[in-house]
Design a protein with these regions (language model features):
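Substrate-binding clefts and catalytic carboxylate motifs of secreted carbohydrate-active enzymes
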Residues: 2-172
Length: 172
């Protein structure tokens, strides 16, 4: 009721006729989302396995897949892509058990998400969060900033950068 006239105005004013995009956040899901049908493209931001189910990538992947399937069932003709997904990683921190914050966990996290994407033919794209670590406001939750980058702040690659290079080179 609020968004549809607004979206229609945007479409009318956009001379380039670009797709109208909905970018969701963690609180929006296939049941609660109020605007999925009126946009042209769904972009889903999710951090299953990081902000919830941390350390449980099998459970995180199942939740992610269920959610993506729910959006597809609701909007079967809409392209869906992942706009944000990632896990904080301390560069140089390694753990044989791939615990959270380790470079191994970040790679396993990205691999788990990639397996979900690859199993769903209607997923049209993926955009990992983030290219490089970056500064954030000082607080006790993020020591030294957001560390979800696949490169450090000085642009040194983490293990994840090598993993993504291999993954994306293999996509046809």
């Amino acid at each position: 009721e609020y968004f549809e006239p607004l979206l229609n105005l945007v479409r009318e004013l956009d001379e380039q006729k670009r797709p109208a995009t909905l970018v969701t956040y963690e609180g929006s899901n296939p049941v609660s989302c109020k605007v999925a049908e009126i946009c042209d493209l769904l972009i889903i931001n999710r951090y299953r396995g990081w902000y919830d189910t941390e350390g449980n990538l099998r459970g995180a992947a199942a939740l992610l897949k269920d959610e993506l399937e729910g959006f597809h069932k609701r909007c079967p003709d809409k392209p869906i892509m992942l706009g944000e997904y990632g896990a904080d990683t301390i560069a140089g921190f390694h753990d044989i058990n791939a615990r959270i914050f380790s470079e191994e966990y970040q790679v396993d996290f990205l691999r788990a998400y990639g397996e979900v994407f690859d199993s769903l033919p209607y997923i049209t794209g993926e955009h990992v969060w983030n290219f490089a670590d970056f500064a954030t406001a000082e607080n006790i939750k993020r020591v030294g900033g957001n560390k979800k980058g696949v490169f450090t702040r000085d642009r040194s690659p983490k293990m994840a950068a090598h993993f993504l290079k291999e993954r994306w080179e293999g996509i046809s």
